[in-house]
């Protein structure tokens, strides 16, 4: 069953034990055209990652030289995403983009594949404050199993590192927000 726009909620997760969502990873797929948000929503896209590490029309990724946050187009895009029920994914976003999303949006947003920056000091990971904001806004966080995000020495990454990130996020209040 395809969930309708706006049905991305806790009750949807409890009703459907096994779920899949149509997603777009990298808002660059909008091609700088705001009307593409509506088009993606109509074909069933429910989640969109705003950037993929680098700068795009929406804003700055974690590896962008220019850490501008959301662009003017990006501000329009996140408003349209909220309007059409596409959940914003801030994985790959710069810190500036993250906080612009906090200030420009009202609905929960998510980080589908991000770990704790306290455990592994990688700028791609989330700070404690960012984790707490996602929780407070009713969003979700999914762990990332990439070695470089799990351990400061990626060659040594193992399952224990996954557990460390999981336990740490749970200690910050992610008990119902960690996927």
Task: List PLM regions with ranges.
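Short acidic/histidine-rich active-site segments
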Residues: 144-145, 172-179
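A metal-dependent hydrolase metal-coordination microenvironment
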Residues: 1-34, 62-83
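Acidic (Asp/Glu)-rich catalytic clusters
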Residues: 1-3, 8-15, 38-45, 101-105, ...
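A short, acidic, amphipathic alpha-helical segment used as a generic capping/interface helix at domain edges
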Residues: 162-172
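Short, acidic/polar
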Residues: 30-40, 165
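Catalytic core of soluble alpha/beta enzymes
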Residues: 57, 95-154
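Metal-dependent enolase-superfamily TIM-barrel catalytic cores that perform enediolate-based chemistry
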Residues: 39-95
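Charged helix-capping and loop-helix junction motifs
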Residues: 71-73, 123-129, 158-164
């Amino acid at each position: 069953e395809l969930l309708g726009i706006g049905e991305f909620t806790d009750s949807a997760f409890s009703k459907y034990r096994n779920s899949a969502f149509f997603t777009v990873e990298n808002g660059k797929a909008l091609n700088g055209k705001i009307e593409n948000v509506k088009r993606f929503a109509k074909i069933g896209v429910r989640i969109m990652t705003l950037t993929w590490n680098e700068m795009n029309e929406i804003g700055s990724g974690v590896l962008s030289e220019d850490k501008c946050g959301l662009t003017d187009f990006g501000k329009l895009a996140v408003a349209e995403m909220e309007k059409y029920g596409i959940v914003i994914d801030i994985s790959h976003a710069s810190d500036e983009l993250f906080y612009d999303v906090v200030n420009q949006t009202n609905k929960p947003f998510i980080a589908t594949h991000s770990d704790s920056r306290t455990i592994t000091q990688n700028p791609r990971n989330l700070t404690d404050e960012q984790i707490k904001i996602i929780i407070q806004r009713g969003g979700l966080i999914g762990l990332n199993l990439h070695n470089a995000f799990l351990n400061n020495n990626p060659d040594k990454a193992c399952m224990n590192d996954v557990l460390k990130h999981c336990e740490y996020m749970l200690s910050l209040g992610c008990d119902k927000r960690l996927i």
